[in-house]
Amino acid sequence: VALLQGLTYPEYSAGRLMQRDLVAVPAFWTVGETIDFMRASPDLPDDFYDLFVVDPRHRPVGTVSLSRVLRNRRAVRIDDIMSVDLSPLPVSMDQEELARVFRQQDLVSAPVVDDDGRLVGVVTVDDVVDVIDEEAEDDLMKMGGVLEDDLYRAAFATARSRSTWLAVNICTAFLAATVISLFEATIEAVVALAVLMPIVASMGGNAATQTLTVAVRALATRELSASNAMRIVWKETVVGMFNGVAFAILVGLVAFAWFQDVLIGLVIAAAMVVNLVVAGFVGVVIPVVLDRLKIDPAIAASIFVTMVTDVVGFLAFLGLGTLVLL
């Protein structure tokens, strides 16, 4: 019966995750009555951390930890030792949101209530640890554009599921190639630019991926929101500038030593700063925008971020090369 009831709740919801075996007692009971009840009850859960205090309509009004019950005298009333700092979870709450609540409030367990606010189950930290592992794995799979069961699916089905974002990626790659084609004459005149181009694109892509990973994770945990988005965008842009200047000096010196041309060193150094600043900026802005559009940034953001850093990197490097070297 419990299994059938659980299947009536949405998949990946608190209703599916919760345990129905719990200890609920009225507020007017004493510690002694509560202990006697637990000793006599054949349906207690094997392991539990908290007792839930309910009103006559079976709505949770407080909690008491098992250790606190055992430390108090038998005559003490439950409502005198209970905590009213409750975090009831709706049965329909998504398990990712549920895990965020546990993480933010350092909960050990939390009551689950139905639409009428009545206690129907409990979620414990043991269950939430599994959810956090599942969600982290799911986000990792999405960022790679693959599915969890790809290892066991037929080759054609796997290829079809991966083809969508590969098709989007090839369109963005052609856009980057179009930018390069605008500077054919420059590349023909200064072959060193063709040699150094991958460095600019690679550094921008890696810097953007670092920022993107932080932003996607912060969005998933609700640490990145409208209230602090501008501050995080500014911070990551400044980080990009610092790294850009540091690596610009390094790459500029290497390019100068390689080609014996100061101007080539200056061009790639300037392009490096521009691309890493842009990488820091778009690494936050793009996932935030996708999240606002209800598109999962873990799936789509990396493609668009890579496109921007490639286009900006090539445009800055080859554009500066055209202005300075020709």
Predicted regions and their residues:
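Cytosolic regulatory modules rich in charged/polar residues
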Residues: 1-195
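Alpha-helical transmembrane segments and their membrane-interface boundaries
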Residues: 132, 136-281, 285-308, 316-326
